[in-house]
A protein has these predicted regions:
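Long, basic/Gly/Ser/Thr-rich N-terminal segments
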Residues: 1-128
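P-loop NTP-binding catalytic core
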Residues: 100-158, 163
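Glycine-rich phosphate-binding loop of nucleotide-binding enzymes
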Residues: 137-199
Length: 199
């Protein structure tokens, strides 16, 4: 009978990059982690002194057991249990990286070091975006099921003197987008605005 130590979810070593390529990252997480498609993760590479960002694209159950059908056995839970050898395998697409020294953002043309720490970003991690964004707010940054409240998504007013379309199916947030967008445009007072909302 196997006795496995239960996962210490507070141990950051459980969230670590295990590989793939410069085009696709893979990391593991405890089996009971609440992860979602579209969630943005921060990958801290202390070897290269950079912070990578990636968006989750797939989640699957995985284990370290040699028996690939261990979880279909009648007494699987009794013999194997859910511990540190059972985990979630997470696939993610790279978004880019920021140099910790200078703060410059780069396209993902390199790969994080193996076993780099994977964590949730906070508003401060996205501070580099404030230099890249404009002054017209259109909403807040989303990460999976959550909103990163400290990170407003803004577009530069210089690109607005032209026609713009907002297209989506019902319930996708068009009206909310237009509400925030119009309020931000009125606050800036740099141009006129005509909104057509056909039904």
């Amino acid at each position: 009978m196997m006795n496995l130590r239960d996962i210490d979810a507070g141990d950051p070593s459980k969230y670590r990059l295990i590989g793939r390529s410069v085009l696709s990252y893979k990391f593991i997480a405890p089996y009971d982690s609440a992860l979602y498609i579209g969630q943005i993760k921060k990958i801290t590479d202390t070897t290269k002194n950079v912070t990578f960002f990636a968006k989750i694209t797939d989640l699957s159950h995985d284990s370290n057991f040699a028996d690939s059908r261990w979880d279909t056995r009648v007494y699987a839970e009794e013999f194997y249990g859910l511990g540190e050898d059972v985990f979630l395998a997470v696939d993610a697409v790279p978004l880019g990286y920021v140099e910790n020294s200078g703060g410059a953002f780069h396209k993902p043309r390199t790969i994080p070091s193996k076993f780099s720490l994977v964590d949730d970003p906070d508003g401060e991690d996205f501070s580099f975006l404030t230099d890249l964004m404009g002054e017209i707010e259109v909403g807040l940054m989303r990460s999976g099921q959550d909103v990163i409240r400290d990170v407003a998504v803004c577009i530069p007013s210089r690109i607005l003197p032209q026609h713009m379309g907002v297209f989506a199916t019902t319930g996708m947030g068009k009206s909310n987008f237009m509400r925030v967008f119009c309020a931000s445009c009125m606050k800036e007072r740099k141009f006129g605005l005509l909104v057509v909302d056909p039904h």
